[in-house]
Amino acid sequence: MTLDKKATLLDVKIYQASGDVGIDSHAFIMANGVKYDYIGSKQLPKGVFVKVPECGYVAATLRFKPMPESTTEFDFRETADNSGWNIYGVRLDGKRPQANIPQHLLQQALDKNSKLPSTDLNLGKTVVAVRLLGYKPEYKTTLDIIADNWFSPYRMPYEHDSISVDGTCQVSANAILPTVATIRVNRTEIPFLAVPNDTTTVTIDLPTLTLAATHLFANDANVKNYVWFEGKHAAIDTELQSVKTKIDVFGVTSFDDICGMTPLQYRDYVQQSYERLLTAINSNAAIGSATRTLAQSILSMNYASALFGFKNNISMAPMIAGKRGVPRADMSIDTVSYFKPLEKLAVLHSKNQRYYSYLRDFTSSLRRKYISADPLLDDIAVGKRLSRSFNRKRPLTEQQMAAAHDSIANDMVRELLFANNEDLKSQLASADNILAEVKKSANQNSTFSIIDIDPKMSAEQILPTITDRYKGKAVLIDLWNTWCMPCRAAMSAIRPLKEQMTDVVYVYIADASSPVGKWGEMIKAISGVHVRLTKEQADALAELYKFSGIPTYFVVNKEGKITYQKTSFPGVEKLKEQLMSAMQ
């Protein structure tokens, strides 16, 4: 940064994998309670989007109204409502933002000889108490707890109360076995061992975590330690942080690599990744035997799951990687030879498989051929089938309850299913009250509105019902959810376009997988028309219009006809081009 008498100059690098970037014309710097407006930039002129080059970032010098030369700290805010890029507490005195870490955590002595908890069934609540040091409500920090217990929605965050003003939040979830769960703060994932009838206390240094998530400081050794655990398994939880990138054999970046692969090429790729990661875990001297066993078990189960999922992963790779023209691979395989490596996978014949959060994935007939016989899997399979309605926010019917009594042999497995059912009922009752408050707020607000859609409305009727009221205008429909990070990133990129094309109607459609409380808070900062569907309606809409992911966009012309459809963000210029055409 340069503090000049005529302007404040801020040198920036904006990282993005692809597409276009721009700076909101309402951006400003805040220092000592005074606002300094954005003047412009040669590299990123107001209202202009710049394509991200192959290097993955755009470098620019942003000009703001002049700040006093005595300024030592400032906030960069792209929008006043915190919906854009926001960077808080930037220091100009050479010091880094710091939180006050309690002394007992800094002096914490961890037991390297900690033992893993038993894999015997033990039904109860797992409680997570989180404290964010250095937290301020205006930061709009997102916090999710992801803990799977077989009969909960797949990798979906648990609903929880808002983060308190002091940065604390507590959530409890039903649990029957110790498994690796995840705390997600903004985009940073923190794994920990969620154990039934146990409480884990987690303290997070938010300023340091935020620095560690940036390109500038990602490899800085001084920002590696930002989380402390307290509880019976604090040592294991702490050590997990050093191997958290080693326990998933198939990450998002892998989709680039596997585009166009045959099943055998894919198997070899996954196997090589597994062996490389396993070697890294085994050679990590910073972890004890318990953490090593846990990491080996989770990695091995993920490896097996990746092999079984070859068809889906290869098919989805081009879309996820954003590559066009990739020829479809022949998916036929010789099952016996293809899955032969699994015959030597020890975890499939060990109770350590129970540490795997997604053990329910191994209840299919194909996967059961390679895993030791266990009556527990039979009960999980029944519960999995009965709990499918939970994904659609529907409690069990009386008939389903009776089927559970008749078909699930293990009492604790049955009670876990029923406990999830009761939790869902409570959530729905609470959600109705929250939704009523959100609608009330929308009626009093001029920047966003809500359209009610009958939960029984068919997929064929949904889009026409929404767009018919806007005939004579072009409409951009954005299908998203609160948990979809690419969706949210795209919204930020589109914001300046919305300022330019004010005659367009912007419609945002989410479904019941978005916690209603979080959805209600987020839409306050997303100007436009908002719609909330049931999960069944969202699935039916995807089937009708033949798309399999989000974000998905529709452009509707003045006559109410869909003229453009795209899954994954196509870039600002493409949307602008399609909207201009729809306005003709």
Where are these regions (language model features)?
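Oxidative protein folding and maturation machinery
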Residues: 123, 206-472
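Short, solvent-exposed, Trp/other aromatic-anchored flexible loops in extracytoplasmic proteins
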Residues: 39-73, 78-81
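Conserved redox-active cysteine motifs that mediate thiol-disulfide chemistry
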Residues: 479-496
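A non-transmembrane, solvent-exposed segment enriched in polar/low-complexity residues
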Residues: 91-289
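Thiol/disulfide oxidoreductase modules built on the thioredoxin-like
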Residues: 536-580
